[in-house]
């Protein structure tokens, strides 16, 4: 695996990760995102429908929490989870937890970390964790770590220090077991940067993890509410400054478009794509614009639709402040609303996804109010393609030195 940077501007890194996979013939563009999956499958989608989406990332994200209870079957299968789930050609990254599902705290010890499957808690010692990775045979996997300390909540310095110490100990033990395993020689361990909101511990975690022979870094625990964003971004800038430039940086729990751009400016390369899934589960469609150089004629055609979405933002803010639905964002429209009952426009004018080319907002509204499964399929296809297109435009903006215009456009819609 080799990270090749073609451009670095104000902290933003543009390039490719080359020689990926067991055969070394895959490449991945950065900045980019991973394909979010549930138990190895894109939510709501079959492999056939997934192939109809443009710009699908080269690497899929699997979660250990969803696969841990099946490891005995995979151990007997012996050919890895990629072939087992019908994705033998895909690059696979195994993370500890599902970013959408919150994990109960208080179950990390000096010897184990707990993950939560459908059946309940699964305790992971280092040896059990590495045995499962041996059965899964992913291309990359997140090392075992104590991720209960984050920027979300104030935590004692003693607890934060313990989190960093445990994570480094887990990393050393995992690296030792990887060296002893012939199967895992082809897999890359991603070291985890912990430390909560304590600058000193974040920097210690970054420096110590960078001393180990890891293939990349996962910046964990940077998710939080908007009021702490500035503090989190200051931490992030300081941490990435300590990391080597020739290894990829992933971040967990950050997927909103405005936060993605802030993190890219601070040197983050790869993101999770759970945001489109969350939007789909709300019965919503992503409609935010990321075309920072729009065609004037198309702009006139889209003006009415854009004005409608701007009007919706005030309603969304009211919903957020009253607490009825704190998750809904200004990047999406709620197709369950009655006003879409006779709206025969596509979800987004000019969108090339299957849903927008073949169906209307009124049809999706009908599917949602009648609880048809097809609603989730069509919304997921659109939301994934829209989100993946956003990352394509980020890379194009970096190439042409237009990231400031893109960021202004996104933040105007987020405000």
UniProtKB/Swiss-Prot annotation:
GO biological process, one term: tRNA-guanine transglycosylation
Gene Ontology CC, one term: cytoplasm
GO molecular function (one): tRNA binding
Cofactor(s) this protein requires: Zn(2+)
Cytoplasm keyword on record: yes
InterPro entries assigned to the protein according to its UniProt record, in alphabetical order: QTRTD1, Queuine_tRNA-ribosyltrfase, TGT-like_sf, tRNA_ribo_trans-like
Sequence positions that bind Zn(2+): 351, 353, 356, 382
Pfam family, one: TGT
Consequence when changing residue 118 to D: Does not significantly affect ability to promote formation of hypermodified nucleoside queuosine tRNA
UniProt keyword annotations, A-Z: Cytoplasm, Membrane, Metal-binding, Mitochondrion, Mitochondrion outer membrane, tRNA processing, Zinc
Family: Belongs to the queuine tRNA-ribosyltransferase family. QTRT2 subfamily.
PANTHER family named in the record: QUEUINE TRNA-RIBOSYLTRANSFERASE ACCESSORY SUBUNIT 2
Purpose: Non-catalytic subunit of the queuine tRNA-ribosyltransferase (TGT) that catalyzes the base-exchange of a guanine (G) residue with queuine (Q) at position 34 (anticodon wobble position) in tRNAs with GU(N) anticodons (tRNA-Asp, -Asn, -His and -Tyr), resulting in the hypermodified nucleoside queuosine (7-(((4,5-cis-dihydroxy-2-cyclopenten-1-yl)amino)methyl)-7-deazaguanosine).
Protein name per the record: Queuine tRNA-ribosyltransferase accessory subunit 2
Protein species of origin: Homo sapiens (Human)
């Amino acid at each position: 695996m080799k990270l090749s940077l073609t451009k670095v501007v104000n902290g933003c890194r543009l390039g490719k990760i080359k020689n990926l996979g067991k055969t070394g013939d895959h490449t991945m563009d950065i900045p980019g995102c991973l394909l979010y999956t549930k138990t190895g499958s894109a939510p709501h989608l079959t492999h056939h429908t997934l192939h109809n989406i443009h710009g699908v990332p080269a690497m899929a994200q699997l979660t250990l929490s969803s696969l841990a209870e099946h490891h005995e079957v995979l151990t007997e299968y012996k050919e890895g989870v990629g072939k087992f789930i019908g994705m033998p050609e895909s690059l696979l990254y195994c993370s500890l937890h599902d970013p959408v599902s919150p994990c109960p705290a208080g179950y990390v010890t000096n010897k184990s970390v707990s993950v939560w499957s459908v059946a309940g808690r699964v305790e992971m010692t280092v040896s059990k964790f590495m045995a499962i990775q041996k059965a899964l045979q992913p291309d990359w996997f997140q090392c075992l770590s104590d991720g209960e300390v984050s920027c979300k909540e104030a935590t004692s310095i003693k607890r934060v220090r313990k989190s960093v110490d445990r994570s480094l100990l887990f990393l050393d033990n995992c690296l030792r077991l990887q060296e002893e395993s012939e199967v895992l020689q082809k897999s890359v361990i991603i070291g985890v940067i912990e430390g909560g909101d304590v600058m000193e511990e974040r920097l210690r975690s970054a420096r110590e993890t960078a001393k180990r022979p890891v293939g990349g870094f996962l910046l964990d625990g940077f998710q939080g509410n908007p009021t702490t964003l500035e503090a989190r971004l200051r931490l992030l800038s300081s941490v990435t400054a300590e990391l080597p430039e020739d290894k990829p940086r992933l971040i967990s729990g950050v997927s909103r478009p405005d936060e993605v751009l802030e993190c890219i400016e601070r040197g983050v390369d790869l993101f999770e794509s759970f945001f489109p899934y969350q939007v789909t589960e709300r019965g919503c469609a992503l409609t935010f614009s990321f075309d920072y150089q729009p065609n004037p004629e198309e702009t006139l055609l889209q003006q009415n639709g854009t004005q409608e979405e701007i009007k919706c933002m005030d309603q969304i803010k009211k919903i957020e402040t009253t607490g009825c639905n704190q998750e809904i964002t200004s990047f999406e429209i709620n197709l369950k609303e009655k006003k879409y009952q006779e709206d025969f426009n596509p979800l987004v004018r000019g969108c090339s996804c299957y849903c927008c080319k073949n169906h209307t907002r009124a049809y999706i509204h009908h599917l949602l109010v009648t609880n048809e499964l097809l609603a989730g399929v069509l919304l997921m296809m659109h939301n994934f393609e829209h989100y993946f297109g956003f990352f394509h435009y980020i890379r194009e903006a970096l190439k042409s030195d237009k990231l400031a215009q893109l960021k202004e456009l996104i933040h105007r819609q987020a405000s």
